[in-house]
Amino acid sequence: NKFELYWTPKEIDSKDLPTNEEFIKEIDPDYYEPYPKGAAGIDHYRSLTYTFSGEIPVMINPEFIYSCQMPTSDAPLVAAAPFKLGGWGGLNLVQDLIDAYQMVDGQDINESSQDYPYPDASVNFERIGGANQTFSGFTLLASTARMYNNREPRFYATIGFCHSFWPGTSSSENQYKNIEVTYYSDGYASANPDHPEDYNRTGYTCVKYRHLEDEMKKGTVKAKYFPVFRYAETLLNYVEAINELREPYTLEMPNGSQVTVEHNTADIVKYFNLIRHRAGLPGITEAVAADRNKVRELIKHERRIEFACEGRRYHDLRRWGDAMEAYNRPISGCNVKARSNERQKFYTTTILNDKLTRRSFSYKHYFYPIPKSVLDKNKNLVQNPEWR
């Protein structure tokens, strides 16, 4: 019982659960129960962002199993922050990832509900309008595109997008705090004049490791730790393992006892839903858990979102055998060549095809080549496929 998912209780400024209760209860009857049985009673945004932003010291965070401290001079925050805020502005996230984040009621954007619809392409670029939305210390500006409204808490805890709000509250100078960051060609996050090729090419970046106080010019940066291994991965690893089991498996323990592990839909539901409920989203039922293929795809989705910008997807795509499809798909994002008076053009999904964004993956890339010096020492060794 040493490790568990980190969560923080609901506060006065926490966002309420989705209001389409009847619709969600058909998906997850326990959703409106208190956490961990359901998703009620916790602050989903803070429960996610406090783990990475430095708000909660790693020594008292029960989710961190292994971690390492990140240097403030060379960290995801520096890579993501705009040049004008002391960063490099070159950490790009792709449109595929953005579109994978669900709506606040757990529906995919292409299957959104009537209560929380994903806007049509003819209007998705328009401003949300009205007053700025504030919840859990996060500010969603009224100038934000409608396509980013009513998305799941992990979206706001992870993704920096055009018209994102960067508080930088520790700054001693107003010019570096409370900044509306835009990625238009004439926007706030435009390129460093000394390095014109070093700019954000997709209009999306990672804010997972950003604290509200962080400001690198005239302020301070919170100490942060990178999650080498955290309890959320233990849970999803276990769910994936028992989903793939075809027959019971018995382990001999050091004390002479035996432990038998088998395909268990109740465990799949219990531990998968811990992750979903912490994120403020509906879980699954045992009826869904009984479908191995369905659960496999759900796990792939959940790992992509839960561990975004944590270095897990590199290995996941390879062990699943999905890397060729994923990496040979063109990179796309916003049209960052558009100016601020060309809003619709900016938000039109654009394929990137220059020397810095082209990528390819062939079968041989699943393996490393065996060095020639090693092959020369042992004539019985055979080089890995396609490495000649």
Description of each model-found segment:
Residues 2-17, 105-113, 170-177, 246-253:
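Internal, charge-rich low-complexity segments
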Residues 3-102, 183-206, 211, 218-231, ...:
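Long, intrinsically disordered, low-complexity segments
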Residues 128-275:
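C-terminal substrate/ligand-recognition segments
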Residues 66-154, 160, 165:
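Segments forming glycine/polar-rich beta-alpha architectures that bind adenosine-containing cofactors
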